[in-house]
Amino acid sequence: AIVAKAKAANIPVISYDRLILNTADLNYYLSFDNAAVGALQGNALLTAMGAKATLSASVVEINGDPADNNAKLFKQGAHSVLDGKVTIKKEYDTPGWKPENAQTEMQGALTSLGNKVDGVLAANDGTAGGAIAAMKTAGVTPLPPITGQDAELAAIQRILAGEQYMTVYKAIKAEAEAAAQLAYDLAFGVAVPSTMTNGKTVNNGAADIKSVLLTPVAVTKSNIQSTVVADGFWTKADICTSAYASACTAAGIS
């Protein structure tokens, strides 16, 4: 209703971060390439699994909220990489993205699989945290590689501690700046540079919407310094508390 009212008043509409579905009244969609997020996670998991990344492997996939369109795209991206390379023995969609729901899901997977898990595709850092809690409670040692997303502080620290393999960093500042520029151009009738979209569109169920899709970045222990620290997303003081001081030094965080 809000989008329709804006259209009726000749006000441009940008769908920011999440795609508004089933309306042709959008001017632009601006977000990160969410299928690419899932693909980054899938590729990172295969890398971390190494020689275990075979069809005999036991992988658990913990997706996001089934009502969230972004979660659907993350899932598609992950499957585009993992399908045919490993066997996803258990897969869950996690209501509300809640870590406690992910923990319950992982507990069920461990019970079903007899604690044999070679890798966990977790769609974000919250679900990763829930899955890790379940595995610790079950006494899974060593922890299998597990993915994440959002570069949450707790996840960065888990990566340093060796409990989580990776996260996906989405530079919020770059997204906000792109949205501000796009809003300015639309409001003042300035031609939007073709380089912003590079001809990309995303179908929302009603139309192909011109889309600005920013590039997500995989973060592992080796590039925390050059990504989230370099961008000021987290500082050394944030990350390197006493419990993580030696791990920070080893990872070259300054």
Task: Label every model-predicted segment.
Residues A1-S254:
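A residue-level marker of the well-folded mature domains of exported/periplasmic proteins
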